[in-house]
């Protein structure tokens, strides 16, 4: 090709490109919604700002979590949507939610109705509450207090779901594994994978983690274990159970049978469960056939952005089969060291909308309750104080919850707001790390949660 032809071809390309930019809005329907950059951005290498409220900027932000667990957090920075929830009505999946201001922030009205309706059935069927959270709920903290109140009020027995391998002792049951009648450590038991935490503990190509976000794999190296359960401390309703369910793949045998659920011979407080075969175990539930069952599912180091990485069918089937009427999400604390600007706070809050929507699709008959982080302490210029953005984080999580038709409880405000963690430390309710509660503090937080929830139920 001759040089003048090459030059002519290049000029034609620029003319065509300029024409596309000029008529960008007119041609967008024919381009499948593609947005053309401004012509100046093409030459300068910069993308012009887009005013469309539906546009999203997605970044992968490396995040060092408070629990010393590294992961990458997908953050969608959408200032317009984050601020838009100040309005009084929102349309979510063709449903309008009326919003009111409360002592715990903006709240959508009627969003606990499905849970409250479910409680009316607790006398004749099982009603389930699934409590997900970060390390603040480890050891069954907060959950156990809420469970006790709910079971005392509406009936129900048992601690609910337990992982096959328990590495973090709980305040409710003593649990360990036996192989050939010998007690073994978690390292000596089946291989485990987690949807949260370090990458080397996650599965390479499968999203089968079950309802708890973790799976124990029985294989030729470990194909038979006995799970031992006995009560811990003072007996409560959570230590009695009359029904067993094992959530596992079909080839797993429970006490030599392929039947994975059924009534026990009596109401028990201790049990040995023989589990064998080649397959996967997602959880073991000790429960009753009626009343309220409350599951404690801590995800150490988690920010709450993992549910969309889990298997949709497994979650959907579990929530439907167990009549799950309330899903509690208690997250946000682990992102505070990173969320040191308002933009980052809004980005994290917006990212949680995707998780809420996903869980609502999986559990259409359940209410969703988001619990924000507690007050948390850091050191600024040598002085111990609350994280500077903790109040803003609480506000933004309340707003996105209202926008998504999700209930919100502010643990931060229930504690007393900014600086309250120091007060709780002085009262012996919180640890010296300025993040976690002692058991007494977790009991108090659980009581405050129940008092708030009971008012909602009675209203």
Q: Which stretches of residues belong to each language-model region?
A:
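Hydrophobic membrane-insertion alpha-helices, especially the h-region
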Residues: 7-25
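Catalytic His-Asp segment of secreted/periplasmic serine-dependent ester chemistry enzymes
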Residues: 26-29, 374-459
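Short, basic, low-complexity termini and linkers enriched in Ser/Thr/Gly/Pro
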Residues: 41-64, 68-107, 459
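Alpha-helical scaffolding within the catalytic cores
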Residues: 107-118, 307-321, 353-358, 391
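Sec-exported extracytoplasmic/periplasmic mature domains
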Residues: 120, 137, 141, 147-155, ...
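Short hydrophobic beta-strand that contains or immediately precedes a catalytic carboxylate
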Residues: 129-133
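Conserved SGNH/GDSL esterase-like catalytic core that processes O-acyl groups on lipids
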Residues: 138-242, 253-350, 436
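Conserved, well-ordered alpha-helix/loop/beta-strand core segments that scaffold catalytic motifs
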Residues: 296, 326-332, 349-360, 367-376, ...
């Amino acid at each position: 090709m001759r040089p003048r032809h090459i030059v002519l071809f290049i000029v034609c390309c620029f003319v065509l490109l300029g024409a596309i930019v000029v008529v960008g809005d007119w041609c967008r329907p024919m381009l499948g919604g593609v947005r053309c950059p401004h012509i100046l951005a093409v030459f300068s290498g910069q993308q012009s700002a887009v005013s469309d409220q539906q546009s999203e900027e997605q970044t992968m932000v490396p995040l060092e979590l408070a629990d010393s667990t590294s992961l990458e957090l997908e953050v969608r920075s959408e200032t317009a949507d984050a601020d838009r929830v100040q309005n009084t009505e929102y349309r979510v999946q063709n449903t309008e939610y009326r919003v009111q201001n409360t002592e715990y922030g903006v709240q959508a009205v009627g969003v606990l109705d499905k849970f409250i309706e479910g409680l009316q059935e607790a006398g004749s069927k099982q009603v389930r509450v699934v409590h997900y959270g970060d390390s603040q709920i480890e050891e069954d903290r907060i959950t156990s207090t809420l469970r006790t109140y709910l079971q005392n009020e509406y009936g129900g027995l048992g601690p609910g779901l337990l992982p096959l391998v328990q590495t973090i002792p709980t305040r409710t049951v003593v649990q360990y594994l036996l192989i050939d009648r010998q007690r073994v450590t978690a390292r000596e038991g089946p291989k485990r994978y987690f949807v949260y935490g370090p990458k080397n503990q996650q599965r390479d190509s499968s999203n089968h983690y079950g309802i708890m976000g973790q799976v124990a794999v029985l294989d030729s190296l470990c194909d038979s274990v006995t799970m031992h359960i006995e009560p811990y401390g003072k007996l409560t309703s959570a230590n009695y159970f009359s029904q067993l369910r094992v959530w596992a793949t079909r080839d797993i045998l429970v006490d030599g049978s392929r039947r994975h659920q059924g009534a026990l011979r009596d109401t028990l407080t201790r049990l040995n469960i023989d589990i064998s075969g080649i397959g996967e175990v997602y959880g073991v539930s000790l429960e009753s056939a009626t009343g309220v069952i409350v599951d404690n599912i801590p995800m150490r180091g988690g920010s709450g952005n993992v549910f969309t990485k889990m298997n949709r069918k497994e979650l959907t089937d579990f929530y439907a089969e167990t009549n799950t009427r309330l899903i509690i999400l208690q997250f946000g604390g682990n992102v505070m060291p990173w969320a040191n600007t308002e933009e980052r706070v809004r980005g994290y809050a917006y990212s949680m909308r995707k998780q809420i929507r996903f869980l609502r699709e999986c559990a259409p008959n359940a209410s969703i309750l988001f619990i924000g982080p507690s007050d948390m302490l850091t050191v600024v210029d040598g002085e111990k104080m609350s994280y500077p953005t903790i109040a803003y984080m609480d506000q933004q999580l309340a707003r996105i919850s209202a926008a998504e038709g999700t209930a919100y409880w502010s643990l931060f405000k229930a504690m007393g707001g900014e600086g309250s963690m120091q007060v709780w430390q002085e009262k012996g309710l919180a640890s010296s790390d300025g993040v976690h509660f002692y058991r007494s503090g977790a009991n108090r937080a659980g009581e405050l949660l129940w008092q708030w929830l009971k008012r909602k139920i009675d209203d």
